[in-house]
Amino acid sequence: MDISLERKFLSSFREIGSEKKVCNISSDIIVPDTKADILRVVLTNGEYSIRSKDVESGKVLICGELKVNVVYVPESGTPLSTLCTDIPFECEFEVESADSGCAAIAEIDVISVDTRILNPRKIMINAQVAVSQKCFCNADFSWYSSPGNAPKNAFFKKSSAEARLISAVDEKTFSLEDNFAMQCVDEETQLISTPVLFCTDSADIVGSKLIVKG
């Protein structure tokens, strides 16, 4: 009598590569005709956004954009004036076993953003961003169990082990909107910069949903 063990599967992911790189970004900004000449730069602020994450054969390509705001004192002295530009960048990682069926997650940190005045009508932006990526591929987890129709006099040696599996690699884009009351604001007030910081307080799984609070 032939007895075959029953093989069971559970879909999961496994990490096949992770790496961190520092990307150098540079771009020039020409002062528009509607703006005054630059006397002195007082503030440079940079915020990033991830545009795409592409996984191809043997590599992961992360594309993003750095939004730079520059606040400067014009040659006339007052009032303060601003310049802004969007600088695209990309960072490529070699992941030997990656293919188009894999998924990648990325994190970006702005290390530094500096402004150099080339002349009163032109500045150079030099920035460094740290790009981190992790690449995951599908990996079915399997185990064997005794068949339901096994004879009563058949005995099976069993063992157990704890396994922690990655069950999902996904992302979601959402928008936020809120009002901020400001005092001592008049018609001549200028909005100079709007840095934003996101903080996560908790992440809980409820049924098939991941609830993130922050």
Question: What residues fall within each predicted segment?
Answer:
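Viral structural modules
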Residues: M1-G214
